[in-house]
């Protein structure tokens, strides 16, 4: 498994990845808004956006600089997940979103990909000096809370989110 920065060569596979979420009526997290770009714009414009997102000078507030990656299985070059790694936190992300958003395609769940992908994301942040990584999930999402706990997450708060209209949990993963 490897983190791969999106390129034009992954256009068809990325479109297929997003389509699978729609087919399973499943929520898409950590895609760097790829799903919205495919509905309203183009994959190519999304590539421009995620490249701009890396540099704080190009990011319009309240957004923050971020890296978006595909999580790719090397044997067949299949995108099994996506992860959005935020290099800084806004007030909202500090309270409700955290440093990392991620998802695994519905047909590839329960194979520990999320645990391994989150670990890789935490390592990226650790390399740039962020040693306390915040990650949130819906309280009802036991798979995601398990993924976070498997990476050493410590529950730091639980609260009702007016934005998401549900209880969320915020965890800290400390190096």
Language model regions located:
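Structural motif
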Residues: 128, 150-151
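Charged catalytic carboxylate motif
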Residues: 13, 117, 143
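GNAT-family acyltransferases
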Residues: 1-99, 167-175
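Conserved catalytic-core motifs of GNAT/GCN5-like acyltransferases
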Residues: 136-137, 152-169
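Conserved beta-strand-loop-alpha-helix junction that forms the acyl-donor binding cleft
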Residues: 109, 135-145
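Conserved acetyl-CoA-binding loop-helix of GNAT-fold acetyltransferases
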Residues: 101-104, 110-123, 146-150
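Conserved GNAT acetyl-CoA-binding A-motif
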Residues: 127-136
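Short coil/turn motifs at secondary-structure junctions
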Residues: 88-90, 107, 140
């Amino acid at each position: 498994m490897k983190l791969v920065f999106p390129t034009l060569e992954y256009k068809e596979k990325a479109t297929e990845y997003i389509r699978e979420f729609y087919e399973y009526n499943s929520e898409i997290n950590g895609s760097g808004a790829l799903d919205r770009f495919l509905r309203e714009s183009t994959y190519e414009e999304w590539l421009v956006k995620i490249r701009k997102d890396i540099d704080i000078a190009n990011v319009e507030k309240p957004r923050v600089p971020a890296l978006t990656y595909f999580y790719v299985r090397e044997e067949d070059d299949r995108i099994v997940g996506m992860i959005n790694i935020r290099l800084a936190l806004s007030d909202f992300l500090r309270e409700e979103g955290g440093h990392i958003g991620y998802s695994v395609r519905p047909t590839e769940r329960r194979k520990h990909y999320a645990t391994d992908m989150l670990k890789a994301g935490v390592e990226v942040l650790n390399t740039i000096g962020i040693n306390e990584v915040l990650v949130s999930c819906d309280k009802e999402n036991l798979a995601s809370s398990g993924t976070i706990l498997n990476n050493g997450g410590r529950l730091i708060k639980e609260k009702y989110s007016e934005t998401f209209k549900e209880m969320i949990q915020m965890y800290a993963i400390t190096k």
